[in-house]
Amino acid sequence: MKNYRGVTALLLFVLMAWMLPSHAKPTKTLRFEADTVRVLRNPLNGWVMYLNRNWDGDFWEKAGYDAMKTSDGSVVKVSDYASTAYLRTSWASLEPSEGEYVWRDKSSRYSRMLQSCLDRGLKLALRIVFDGRDQGQNTPMYVINAGAKYYEASNIKTPYMDDPVFQEKYAKFIEELAKDFNDPDKVDFIDAFSPGKWGEAHAVLYQDSRNKAAAFDWMTSLHARCFTKVPIFINYHRMIADSNQNSWSDVVPSDTEGLLLSAIEKGYSIRHDAFGMHDYYQDWEKEFARKWNFRLPILMEGGWITAAHHRYWIDSSGKYREGHSEDVRRGEYEASKEAHVNMMDLRINDEVASWFSLAFDLVKGFVAEGGYRLYPSEVSVPERVRRGADVR
């Protein structure tokens, strides 16, 4: 009863105030149109362009990024449409020998490449891969030589994620990396859980798969402790951290959601690396994204590699025609729209070329409609004010 009396009194006060004569000064209302054309490089907003681990600082011209043809007939710079430059590379390339941190060598190829991006106003993003299957020796050999237990295939040695020697060396590397990249002035985000094939956290190698939860907690806690000033991300897919070497199961492992929630509680946001792949981005993944819409940022990466070995035209959606990369771009765009992603990827090679040369309308569409833009829709101000007076 006490609460009802309080509400009644408040309503009477508001009504009386509304009935009082107004002595407000004349005001003028200004209305603003949203600028949906200009690329705004807000944090976690816009397009992400990918860097090749073999590039140097002059890749802009050599890779055609400064003279990219578009589907409307214009020629543009890719960097004018991107917010972030993303490097996915190996641990071995950044620390070839123990304590040799390549990015700190200003004369190194990596340092020149990253600096060229910063010079253009782009921020950086990183994913460090240590599983070498299908790629090469991604873990530095000093880790293997120190006694880390490993899985070997085609003479490529990948340490088990739950091996104590690996964990010791990897933790030291991440701590050193964070000293230079835990910096929001130059870094947009870090992919902070990257075991398994291609660093996508599936088909993960363990000495004992019963250590899955403990190893997951160790790696996510490490990154959360080291990267305190920049956003950190983890893949949301049903096989997260799982040892299933098929990288897929129609039945979602019972611990998947709990693992992801434990990472989110540590400050992680979420990304997915198979947008547009209808056989790998299914109802479970869509529903997980829906649960976190407008609560966490979501990053998108397309799954199909349209100019390489991927046969994207066999996608179960039936929407992709062989020889038509633009069909895949449109499929990725629609899936991203459904998930309300904050950032989309231009990626590299045929992906970036087809976004611009075959689907430039979608590139501009995401600039206009994706992410966020903060502006006043209208402002009311007094028509006349006295110099030095407060305006309320």
Residue ranges and their predicted role:
Residues 27-68, 118, 189-199, 203-352:
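Catalytic-core regions of glycoside hydrolase
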Residues 151-166, 170-209:
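Active-site groove signature of glycoside hydrolases
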Residues 326-384:
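Catalytic cores of secreted or luminal carbohydrate-active enzymes
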Residues 74-151, 210-231:
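Aromatic-lined substrate-binding rim segments of carbohydrate-active enzymes
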Residues 9-18:
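Bacterial N-terminal signal peptides
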Residues 105, 109, 162-173, 211-215, ...:
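Soluble or luminal CAZymes and related metallo-dependent hydrolases
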Residues 23-86, 92-99, 108-119, 123, ...:
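Non-catalytic accessory regions flanking glycosidase/transglycosidase catalytic cores in CAZymes
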Residues 1-9:
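Bacterial N-terminal signal peptides that target proteins for export
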